[in-house]
Regions:
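Short amphipathic alpha-helical "interface-anchor" segments enriched in bulky aromatics
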Residues: 35, 86-87, 329-366, 404, ...
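Low-complexity, serine/threonine/proline-enriched polar segments
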Residues: 150, 174-191, 329-397
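Charged, often Cys/His-bearing segments associated with DNA-binding zinc-finger transcription factors
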Residues: 1-45, 476-490
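Basic, short loop/linker segments at the boundary and entry of helix-turn-helix/winged-helix-like folds
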Residues: 27-70, 74
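DNA-recognition alpha helix
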Residues: 80-95
């Protein structure tokens, strides 16, 4: 006989509650358990949002933040689609903290009205995640990598047909007038296009990833782990706060214009970064050949550019092919390594670093044709030059000492072409992958707006989402998810 059990209202309620808790998506439960969004909201943001004047808030601050972060974690491309998910998903709605789903205008107004406050949330998360990055890989965490890109605005000029029509006409014109093969219709098209969009002069023309576009330009600083440390939005406010930046008219070369502009933006961007985060003190800088200018190296590697005695020890920047190194009484190859005076294709051997009593560092290079031969009587090995046509009377062969302080561009704290240089410089591509990640996966690309504040807020929210990812991966002790939570969602 099956024993019966009297069901009470409390039992029924408990069963329903257990069913509800078990049905909650595991990823949302993970966020709810390990992330307290209130810890990252500065009191000034809270006071601004819940100001004593004006109407009372129907929707809580944390609900807006969670909704916009969830949108980027799940790669939901539009705000309207996010709101649709909130309407049909009660667990998602309850997790965010909405009792009623706001309309799209509320989301847009939140981004525009609280842009500066979102920046404070991002800056606070940078400081919180720095110890985590140091614990994961201190060597990569001590690297600073910079690159620039742009957010394409929703303007007529970004329609591919706009540029293709101009290029097609120029090709036909060149063919009709029998121009020679040196004529480049793409450069000619770049020169003939307006420097900014007709809808907004702040939307500038840029050449990114092989195509012309009209964008709001931004700069991004990451560490060697690919974690964002700083975001700079290059609008008129940024230019006004850095009057030393000179803005010149564009030339006929899009690549040259981007390189020149990037090199002028680097130092102001780094100054802002170090000013906001005085406790972060990286020692290694990585950048592409756009930053290979003689004026930049002393600012990066010496003096008080970023604070009292605060500068980088090494700068991994490849030499620009358009500007070679100054030649001394010996020849120098493209990596800054002295070559044999009788054979330019034969680089000398790098034999290490030594310091004088004064503390000055010098690099030692020796003849590539020397051999170490052991003296039987003394038991010691000595250098012997085996060259058939020696350039010096010394039996040890030619030796060259390089003093990097005299030429920081040629010797920026490391020797180009060495295994150390090649292995370290490979890490620079993390910033490019990071830019692609925030555009494609964190919903920065394809935004159907030309409003500067909205796009700026979207950029900051992408950075906030990545840093939330870092915090969560540390809380659950899975640092392999430090850059993306997609495996956890799946």
């Amino acid at each position: 006989m099956i024993p019966y059990k009297q069901l009470s209202l409390a039992d029924i309620f408990q069963d329903c509650q257990n069913k509800f808790n078990n049905d909650k998506p595991a990823f949302l439960s993970l966020l709810e358990t390990h992330i307290d969004i209130d810890e990252f909201i500065p009191i000034s943001f809270r006071n601004h949002f819940y100001a004593s004047t004006g109407r009372s808030r129907k929707y809580p601050l944390r609900a807006f933040l969670w909704a916009l972060i969830i949108q980027r974690i799940f790669s939901i491309p539009t705000d309207q689609l996010l709101l649709t998910f909130l309407v049909y998903s009660k667990p998602l709605r309850d997790f965010c903290g909405f009792t009623k789903v706001p309309d799209a205008s509320k989301i847009t107004r939140f981004k525009q009205d609280f842009l500066d406050d979102l920046q404070l949330v991002f800056d606070k998360l940078v400081d919180i995640t720095e110890p985590i990055c140091q614990a994961v890989d201190s060597a990569k965490a001590d690297m600073t990598i910079f690159d620039s890109s742009g957010i394409e605005a929703f303007v007529t000029e970004n329609n591919p047909k706009h540029a293709n029509r101009i290029i097609r006409h120029l090709k036909a014109y060149a063919k009709a007038n029998s121009f020679d093969k040196n004529y480049d219709p793409y450069k000619a098209a770049y020169g003939s296009m307006p420097s900014h969009a007709s809808a907004n002069p702040e939307i500038k023309q840029l050449y990114i990833n092989g195509h012309f576009c009209y964008v709001f330009k931004f700069g991004i600083i990451t560490n060697g782990l690919g974690i964002i440390r700083h975001i700079a939005f290059y609008n008129k406010n940024f230019i006004a706060s850095h009057p030393d930046i000179t803005v010149e008219k564009k030339s006929d070369s899009p690549d040259e214009d981007k390189s020149v502009h990037d090199s002028r933006l680097l130092i102001p961007t780094l100054k802002d970064f170090f000013l906001k985060h005085p406790l972060i003190n990286p020692k290694t800088f990585l950048g592409d050949a756009a930053f290979d200018t003689a004026a930049l190296y002393p600012k990066l590697l010496t003096g008080n550019t970023f604070g009292d005695h605060k500068h980088f020890d090494k700068a991994y920047i490849p030499l620009n092919s358009r500007a070679g190194l100054e030649k001394q009484d010996y020849t120098i190859n493209e990596n800054g390594i002295p070559c044999c005076p009788h054979d330019d294709s034969l680089p000398m051997k790098y034999e290490g670093i030594s310091k004088l009593r004064s503390g000055v560092t010098r690099y030692k290079f020796v003849c590539p044709k020397i051999k170490w031969i052991k003296n039987v009587s003394t038991g010691r090995s000595q250098r012997h030059c085996t060259c058939d046509d020696p350039c010096t009377a010394s039996s040890c062969g030619r030796m060259v000492y390089i003093y990097p302080e005299k030429d920081l561009r040629a010797y920026p704290g490391a020797i180009r072409g060495t295994e150390e240089w090649n292995n370290t410089y490979k890490i620079r591509t993390t910033v490019e992958r990071d830019i692609n990640h925030i555009k494609d996966n964190l919903c920065l690309a394809g935004r159907r707006t030309q409003n500067e504040k909205t796009l700026h807020a979207d950029l900051i929210l992408a950075g906030i989402t990545q840093l939330i990812t870092v915090v969560l991966s540390d809380k659950i002790n899975h640092h392999e998810f430090i850059r993306s939570l997609k495996p956890l969602i799946a």
